[in-house]
């Protein structure tokens, strides 16, 4: 590769409460480890209740924000849609991926533009400090053929982003993971450092119980 990787995404979004700490020890600065709401026990993937927007990862509990020097940028899912069962074997909130989990076509059909609308409307209501839209795209799909369902799904998402954002008064800013991670760290890193200093200053045995 020519350089040491510093951004991480696990297959199937598998993780446990030790994952973020290990990633930090290995030099990773951020990535997309979580998929809010998915429950897939066979893949060691449980993200029920996970914080759905960019945040610093937690060292003891993967589901919430914390103070680790790892910027987590979750996959965007439609939280306005109730948890549904996917026949591949998991429960989830639908996301914008083109095609299915392991196939060119959906296991369960979804209107990508409707999902996009739900995701952005929920983001507007929650108003997180940094608003991101993350789509899971697999490189084994055919995005060149007009007959490809994956290509149609991706086009529906891409064609819908600007009008949906304009309706909310937002400017669309294309960005890589690295750019978002470094921007988030620059803007919010000082508050995390203060939190770490406060924690280190607490007397032994202090508790919020």
Predicted regions and their residues:
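C-terminal domain-boundary segment and adjacent tail
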Residues: 102-209
């Amino acid at each position: 590769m020519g350089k040491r990787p510093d951004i991480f995404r696990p297959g199937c979004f598998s993780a446990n409460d030790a994952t973020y700490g290990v990633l930090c020890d290995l030099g990773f600065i951020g990535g997309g480890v979580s998929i809010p709401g998915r429950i897939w026990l066979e893949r060691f993937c449980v993200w029920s209740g996970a914080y759905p927007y960019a945040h610093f990862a937690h060292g003891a509990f993967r589901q919430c924000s914390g103070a680790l020097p790892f910027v987590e940028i979750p996959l965007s899912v439609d939280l306005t849609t109730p948890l549904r069962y996917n026949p591949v074997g998991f429960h989830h909130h639908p996301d914008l991926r083109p095609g299915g989990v392991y196939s060119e076509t959906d296991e369960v059909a979804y209107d990508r533009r409707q999902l996009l609308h739900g995701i952005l409307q929920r983001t507007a209501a929650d108003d997180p400090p940094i608003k991101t839209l993350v789509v899971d795209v697999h490189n084994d799909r055919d995005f060149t053929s007009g007959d490809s369902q994956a290509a149609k799904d991706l086009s529906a998402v891409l064609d819908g982003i600007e009008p949906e954002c304009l309706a909310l008064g937002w400017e669309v800013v294309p960005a890589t993971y690295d750019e978002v991670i470094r921007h988030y760290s620059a803007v919010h890193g000082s508050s995390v450092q203060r939190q770490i200093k406060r924690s280190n200053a607490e007397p032994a045995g202090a508790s919020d119980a």
